[in-house]
Amino acid sequence: MKVILKSDIANVGRQGEIKEVSAGFARNYLIPQSLVMEANDLNLKIWKRERGILEKHREEIINSAREIAFKMEASKFTAKVKIGENGKIFGSITTATLVKIFEDNGFKVNKRDIILSDNIKEIGDHEISVRFHPEVVAKIKLSVINEKE
């Protein structure tokens, strides 16, 4: 079944694209969730009219995501933590902790957008990736220091 994507869908395509999907997937999931519309003559005419607006809107979103990513990459983030005798920190720095650090510096980030392979458990400089858009990922530097310093 041919469908027009109303939003970006992982492993299917991006908003505004016309894709071929299985009829069951379309009828049982995509259409009830309002993620797609069937690609019939009427919907194709509507889609062609709105396509330019969608592209312009997508570019605005990507540009604003790039702006925020650039500002965050230029900023310095520091986490002050308690340290044990062996040089390791008590507990760990999680995505929730990072969200708080970013908010304290004026940036609103969803914890699901923070790409962290494992919680941070050591002092030093760490690089963290934050996904603002599927096409925009920022590499942010975080310094973990002793809270007594």
Swiss-Prot record:
GO terms for biological process: translation. The keyword Cytoplasm does not apply. Coiled coil: none annotated. It comes from the Bacteria. The keyword Transmembrane helix does not apply. Keywords: Ribonucleoprotein, Ribosomal protein, RNA-binding, rRNA-binding. Gene3D superfamilies: Ribosomal protein L9, C-terminal domain, Ribosomal protein L9, N-terminal domain. Disulfide bonds: none annotated. GO terms for molecular function: rRNA binding; structural constituent of ribosome. One of its GO terms (cellular component) is ribosome. Belongs to the bacterial ribosomal protein bL9 family. Binds to the 23S rRNA. HAMAP family: Ribosomal_bL9. This is Large ribosomal subunit protein bL9. It comes from Endomicrobium trichonymphae. The lineage of its organism: Bacteria, Pseudomonadati, Elusimicrobiota, Endomicrobiia, Endomicrobiales. The gene is rplI.
